[in-house]
Amino acid sequence: MKYYELDNILTKKAHYNFVIGERSNGKTTALLRHIVRDYYESGRRGAIIRQMEEDIKGHKGASLFSGMIEGGMIDELTDGKYQGVKYFNRAYYLGKQDEMDQWTYEKEPFAHIFALSQSLHYKSNSYPNVGTIMFDEFMRHDHVYLVDEVSLFLNLVSTIVREKDIATIFLVANTVSWNSPYFKTFGLKNVSQMKPGDLATVEFKRKRPTGVEIATTIAIEYCENTAEYGGKASDVYFNVDDVRVTDMITDGSFAVANYPKCPHHFTAKNVKLTCWILTDETILRCRLMKVGREVFFFVDSIKRFVKLPGETIGTMQPDWERYEAIRDKRRDLTYSLEFSSDPTHFTNPTMPYADRRTRWLPEALRANRIFFESNEAGEELMYYIALATKRSVAAL
């Protein structure tokens, strides 16, 4: 089996590096190895971020480097100088064992670990000379994120780096979804089009009021799947029909649900109501249909494929021109995360509002009378609902 290595993405020299791929292919270990080696060679420390406090407490925090210790990697990466790691007070210390089996640990840590949910508590602390920041498992299959999570993450990065620019930041996750608030923030709009082995970059350039231009580079790598190199020995345990999960584990396919497809043929005459769900990256058309005695919603995505000169991977983008051409401004309902006084504008499609027409979509969701053009349309709707349930003035 071939484990993941950072060699390809490091050639991009990006400020932010997204690494996604199948489970247990060595993504996290590759970053931990990089942190240890970089500290040994340059003295630059590592910073490891997890979403929740429970992810770093007790045994979970203490066992992070256990596999590397057992595999002799600490000894290998430090040319035999250190053999172990001690976890104390949310920091990691390299240690060596003498001939009498006595352990001695460094006084200064080589890495710190943080819980994003507790990020406000770190503001007054100092974390000098951090060269690598790793956010492990930044993406969740259940779409459950902290309120304003990306802002919390950026604030924590600010706390760690302070005024320096020596840190390289990595965000690592299994391919559980192609929808993530981090992809949106960092301009990664082509994730659903990527294939294992793809490596792409995005560059942001902005001018400060002083006229000085700042350029930030973002790279994303979709790891090659281990099946190309014989796979993992553990693949025998996942040779079952639950393709949604097993393919993510064995070959890195996105763990996307198989959403129900429409069993009926319909025409424009069958459409009784159209609801639009809008974000910067998504236009979903949800049409209430009546076919015979059956009433249901059909959801499709209004997009177009765009491939700019020099791009290796094209992007599916919302087709706003088509949206403006086909929507009925007087009759259609609109859902978005924006605040609006428009009486036909709403936020949460799972809630009925004063307008009686808004009861149809929540009822269809509860009764499972909803069908989708594609799995991607289903994922986009579920992701929007997860965001909309937290959207209110009180949550700002």
Regions found by a protein language model. Name each.
Residues M1-L396:
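Phosphate/NTP-binding elements of NTP-utilizing enzymes
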